[in-house]
Amino acid sequence: SISNHPPYVIPPFFHPKTSEPEMQIVEYADWALRQFFEEARKQPWFDNTIFVLEGDHGKLVGDAECELPESYNHIPLMIYSSRIQPEEKTTFGGQVDIQPTILGLLNIDYLQNNFGVDLLKEERPCMFYTADNMVVGRNDTLLYLYNYETQQELTYDIGNGKLNAVPMDDSFLPLKEYSFSMLQSAEFLVKQIKTDDLKK
């Protein structure tokens, strides 16, 4: 585990090639992962293990392009096993998708209540997430944000890879409805059914 939160702590035995602390922690993370996998390969359990690497959140890269910068929520997910054929997927997903994706790789049947999908078997038409006071819904071309404090809706066209503010119209309604229905469902599970009961 490593953090991109200051203060940046690099072990004294590690000698980075770069001078910027933010780059040094990336160098150290890369080195530490290499060391970890070199040692793991020597273990008898290596070929029977699925390794999952992911970030919990991103970091502001460049200028904030909107009220909730996408770089805060754009995180990597890497799944590795010596028994899995390498491939790269560039479709988006969420942290809720990790569990069903791993269970799918293991061919394990499961009862699932966390709104995730198996990213290797289906593509998400859209995704929602929350951060601070914002609710966000997005797909490949549109970004919908709702600020709870100001009760303001913010809408962007992201189809060309850049965020362009556009007026709210009917094309954003599926994102809005999906995002709020997911939040309401989660709240219902927590308050009414109680998530502890789902574990039984």
Where are these regions (language model features)?
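Solvent-exposed soluble domains appended to multi-pass membrane proteins
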Residues: 1-200
